[in-house]
């Protein structure tokens, strides 16, 4: 028995058309850096407005981290994004 069909099935479980998204740090409009996060409520609002993401939280370094960012929205570290200019 080949393991390929099993591996393919496991990869496809839970994926529906249009569901593609990833997690990441939204970019600041001013300098392409991660956005400062004073608290999780502010981050959740930032994620909704800047990254079209349904949820987010502050990470350990006071940066806003968003969940389920649509693929067409750039996040920090994406190929082709400009470097952070602090």
From Swiss-Prot:
Keyword terms: Disulfide bond, Ion channel impairing toxin, Neurotoxin, Secreted, Signal, Toxin, Voltage-gated sodium channel impairing toxin
Main localization category: secreted
Record's subcellular location: Secreted
Tissues expressing this chain: Expressed by the venom gland.
Keyword flag Zinc-finger: no
Domain LCN-type CS-alpha/beta, residue spans: 22-85
GO molecular function, one term: toxin activity
Disulphide linkage map: 33-84, 37-58, 43-64, 47-66
Superkingdom, taxonomy of origin: Eukaryota
InterPro entries: LCN-type_CS_alpha_beta_dom, Scorpion_toxin-like_sf, Scorpion_toxinL/defensin
Pfam families tied to this protein: Toxin_3
A GO CC term assigned to this protein in UniProt: extracellular region
Signal sequence coordinates: 1-20
UniProt comment concerning the protein's domains: Has the structural arrangement of an alpha-helix connected to antiparallel beta-sheets by disulfide bonds (CS-alpha/beta).
Protein family according to the UniProt entry: Belongs to the long (4 C-C) scorpion toxin superfamily. Sodium channel inhibitor family. Beta subfamily.
Protein function: Beta toxins bind voltage-independently at site-4 of sodium channels (Nav) and shift the voltage of activation toward more negative potentials thereby affecting sodium channel activation and promoting spontaneous and repetitive firing.
Protein name, as recorded: Toxin Tpa6
Native species: Tityus pachyurus
């Amino acid at each position: 028995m080949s393991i390929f069909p099993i591996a393919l099935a496991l990869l496809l479980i839970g994926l529906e058309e249009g569901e593609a998204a990833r997690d990441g740090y939204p970019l600041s409009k001013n300098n392409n850096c991660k956005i400062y996060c004073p608290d999780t409520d502010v981050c959740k609002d930032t994620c909704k407005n800047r990254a079209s993401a349904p949820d987010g939280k502050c990470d350990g370094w006071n940066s806003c981290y968003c969940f389920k960012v649509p693929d067409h929205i750039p996040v920090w570290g994406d190929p082709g994004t400009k470097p952070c200019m602090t």
